[in-house]
């Protein structure tokens, strides 16, 4: 038992130093930290203790061979030279975990196959039975590590990964591994014997790990399946001694100072069952509660609050998360004065929404996500004012005050005007302040924040934080519910991505615009269904269309068609390449009671349809994209380059006294007057007449022209 052997404990990156300390405490081992784990020297009892007691190690490996190889032949020769009969019986199943590559062995599956071949061939040459490979639960697991020419072959004494404690039946959404939960608790600064609160406990892993620490329950006490069970070097007597010592160290005389809260009663039920399985159900108080109503369960004691709040990988979840973290920060100040707080998040910028100053921070990985854990000390003074109001907390922690003040000012001006104009959809803010490069639009009782893509010179994290601040301030100023705020990142459109779905919520509602009802969808597409800056253009087109035949080319969702039809157009024709948007246009017609044979919809490449058109129209509205290279179009389209080609075709189908309303959003667009004259057309720039009050800050957002035959 006194023979000293060097083992290797693997760990997630960033855990190594704490694992070294833990191993010293468990078995007195002298450890050496390397990336991905700790080499530690101990006897066999110490190895068993490490397997049973470690909360941070992923696996414990017993190295068999360490050598240099250059090819798969070297690998095979090394494996077949190992005396496998001294390690396991050929009647036992085995499996090979192969990690790493080099110039010759470029695939881990190939490497694992060569190791497997070497082991099988060894036994067959010794005239033993051929051992069977079992991927799911092998008796023996061989671990192979290859880094360039360095090869290490080890016996995995763990069997299954050590984060699998056995108490979790259902992990729910986005679970924390038990090893990660343990290190979060250890890094939080929590002291045994003091209260520990998790206000968003989910499946309860943080609290269960801490409660087991407090109760002296070793993490692997319930495990039956081990990687050493079939190992010929296993010493059952020593193992039994280690087990008995582990059982004897349980502490049953401890106070139940663990508190778990969660809004979801189903998740809470799973947490309770997990705690029961882990043997700590009697130590943890569970309660269904909303974070907005979070109360300190131990006002007469100082303790630690630790949590892993939800975080979304999709940007669309951000407004709700910002509100969650903001309210969370307020409740911490109100209820947990003098406490230690430790929050772990996969979206580090959300931690800034807590409006707390951290004392320490730690990086960690949760699967592929780069995460951050921040520790805070809540100021003592707040405990003397437990009845501080939420509004005063919000005022004291107001974010982006310049942005908030400008938004408030704009709302007072624009909403009064919008009410007079019978408008439900309008712009409230349009990058008024350079450092807050956003647009804020109201659609009835919803708000859409469009972030203009930041230039490359702006640090991504800084732009992201300003975006979060803007969302927080907008929620505060407008008072809307978080589920009615939509966040979008506006980038340069490439090809057809204006038609691509961003989500699939299917949430439509209609807005009023000068008496027209128009369906909008704020989440599923890059655009919402109406272009707000063209509002006056649509109104003007409607007034011009009375008693006329009307063509809406590049019709989008048909909003201009609705205005034309409501104002008494004789007949309307709407053409767009997107079937999605034409269906939308059809729904708009139906919503306004306009569905009839006089209002036709065509799904087609607009330019191709135009070339084949034999009808003539008295009023044509054309609002083409700035650029398009859609696969559904025969050629690419550039409005600056191709607008005369477009006018050539439009003139052919325009009646002698007809008019074309031509608009586009290309900044710096230059009308080719000579080209128009050669066609017998003349253009009048009416852009200034079509710019509504809420877009006055950006007079170049679109340009608009009325084009006629010269003789008219």
From Swiss-Prot:
- Spell out the subcellular localization from the entry: Cytoplasm
Q: Which one of the record's GO molecular function terms can you name? A: rRNA (guanine-N7-)-methyltransferase activity
Role, per record? Specifically methylates the guanine in position 2445 (m2G2445) and the guanine in position 2069 (m7G2069) of 23S rRNA.
Swiss-Prot/TrEMBL keywords = Cytoplasm, Methyltransferase, RNA-binding, rRNA processing, S-adenosyl-L-methionine, Transferase
Keyword check for Transit peptide, yes or no: no
Q: Give the UniProt family note.
A: Belongs to the methyltransferase superfamily. RlmKL family.
CDD domains referenced in this protein's UniProt entry, alphabetically: AdoMet_MTases, THUMP_AdoMetMT
Name the domain of life. Bacteria
What is the designated name of this protein?
Ribosomal RNA large subunit methyltransferase K/L
Can the keyword S-adenosyl-L-methionine be found in this entry's annotation? yes
Under the heading PANTHER family, the entry gives: RIBOSOMAL RNA LARGE SUBUNIT METHYLTRANSFERASE K/L, RIBOSOMAL RNA LARGE SUBUNIT METHYLTRANSFERASE K_L
Known catalysed reaction(s)?
guanosine(2445) in 23S rRNA + S-adenosyl-L-methionine = N(2)-methylguanosine(2445) in 23S rRNA + S-adenosyl-L-homocysteine + H(+); guanosine(2069) in 23S rRNA + S-adenosyl-L-methionine = N(2)-methylguanosine(2069) in 23S rRNA + S-adenosyl-L-homocysteine + H(+)
Please state the Enzyme Commission number of this protein.
2.1.1.173, 2.1.1.264
GO-annotated cellular components: cytoplasm
Q: By which gene is this protein encoded? A: rlmL
Q: Where is the THUMP domain?
A: 46-157
- The main place the protein resides is cytoplasm
The record's section on Pfam families has: Methyltrans_SAM, RlmL_1st, THUMP, UPF0020
Q: What class of enzyme is it?
A: transferase
Q: Where is the signal peptide?
A: none
Organism of derivation: Haemophilus ducreyi (strain 35000HP / ATCC 700724)
